[in-house]
Amino acid sequence: MARKLFIQTHGCQMNEYDSTRMVDLLESSHGLEPTDNPEEADVLLLNTCSIREKAQEKVFHQLGRWKKLKDAKPDMIIGVGGCVASQEGDAIRDRAPYVDVVFGPQTLHRLPGLITQAASTRELAIDVTFPEIEKFDNLPEPSVDGPSAFVSIMEGCSKYCTFCVVPYTRGEEVSRPVQPVLKEIQHLADMGVREVNLLGQNVNAYQGVGADGDTLDLADLIRLIRDIDGIDRIRYTTSHPVEFSEALIQVYEDVPELVSHLHLPVQSGSDRILAMMKRNHMVLEYKSKLRKLKRIRPDISFSSDFIIGFPGETDRDFEDTMNLIHDIGFDMSFSFIYSARPGTPAADLPDDVDMEVKKQRLAILQQRINQNVQDISRKMVGSTQRILVDGFSKKDPGQLKGRTENNRVVNFQCDDTDLIGKFVDVTIAKAYSNSLLGTDPRNPS
């Protein structure tokens, strides 16, 4: 009987991508088959996130639950990867001594050796170093699960925003060379993938070495991907406003395969708070870039990230954030109450915003964003949307589902399963809180 692998993933899309690569890697090296049931697994891996304090505590709570499984199956291997592993390797050793393997985001390619080492020595095997881009040279070809796929094009971040742990847990920015990225995407296209989502902690800082030794940026890379037969939709995430260049804006005019949606985290609408965060731009600069995009793509939608209650945030600062949300009309966005991360410059600032005030501000902001989301969805009713059909509806197996360019799930009645993996035009008949209902699928391609 094949041995089983269970992976639980916390955090960002980069972690989701890394987890899929771990499955490919360990299936190749150890013959491990993925399972959705941790109780039947021989190897349990936790791919972690350390952006928020609660996310970090979730790791140790989960490990405590897994300890019971290991007590019943002593040969089970438990591994912790991701950003918490990079930041808290010693703490994991102290708080969860039953963990067998600790590895960082840049060393997941060494996971087979670490597992073998831990199994033979029954001692902790740990590697949280930063060997730059080496991991991509040591991974098997990616497997495919549906018509959409993530592709990591760079790692790390060199911006050192005062609140953020990413430079310390994933290292500074390192870009993959252009040709391996194109080769991976060509492989995905050959396997039936129609949409790629380019990933990086600061993806628009991409500076990859091309075939001729020249350096290409994200705009250049998107133009090359556009020419790969079979790839008809391109996304990327996550971007930084400072490096949202004129060349990248121009791509929205030249490359129709690039979706009319942009996630561009701003964090705050207050110039004073942005300076304290070391974001290195002002609100007016941010708005100016979005206005240029709006002139090129009038139907483009925007989403963002917001941190509420950053040290020193006043009522006026929060009002500035709400004014920005009103001016831009942000679609689905992520918002969080500020939590100090150890080792970051902001952790030395007095956390002087009362928690009740933070909660009130977060509720106000989320209510406004949710209203925007519902308004945008309602305005889509009656329109024709091109969606990529990716499978069956979760609630009704008689329906197929797909996603719009602005990332909304559309369910529609259809028994033609040949549409899965194809683009179709559907008419939006109704808007629900978390999805849309489509009718009359046509023009499959």
UniProtKB/Swiss-Prot annotation:
Cofactor binding summary note: Binds 2 [4Fe-4S] clusters. One cluster is coordinated with 3 cysteines and an exchangeable S-adenosyl-L-methionine.
Pfam families: Radical_SAM, TRAM, UPF0004
Principal cellular location given in the protein's record: cytoplasm
Keywords, alphabetical: 4Fe-4S, Cytoplasm, Iron, Iron-sulfur, Metal-binding, S-adenosyl-L-methionine, Transferase, tRNA processing
Disulfide bond annotation, renumbered to this chain: none
Binding sites annotated in the UniProt record for [4Fe-4S] cluster 2: C157, C161, C164
Reaction(s) this enzyme catalyzes, per UniProt: N(6)-dimethylallyladenosine(37) in tRNA + (sulfur carrier)-SH + AH2 + 2 S-adenosyl-L-methionine = 2-methylsulfanyl-N(6)-dimethylallyladenosine(37) in tRNA + (sulfur carrier)-H + 5'-deoxyadenosine + L-methionine + A + S-adenosyl-L-homocysteine + 2 H(+)
Matching PANTHER family: CDK5 REGULATORY SUBUNIT-ASSOCIATED PROTEIN 1, MITOCHONDRIAL TRNA METHYLTHIOTRANSFERASE CDK5RAP1
Function summary: Catalyzes the methylthiolation of N6-(dimethylallyl)adenosine (i(6)A), leading to the formation of 2-methylthio-N6-(dimethylallyl)adenosine (ms(2)i(6)A) at position 37 in tRNAs that read codons beginning with uridine.
UniProt-recorded name of the protein: tRNA-2-methylthio-N(6)-dimethylallyladenosine synthase
Organism of origin: Alcanivorax borkumensis (strain ATCC 700651 / DSM 11573 / NCIMB 13689 / SK2)
Species classification: Bacteria, Pseudomonadati, Pseudomonadota, Gammaproteobacteria, Oceanospirillales
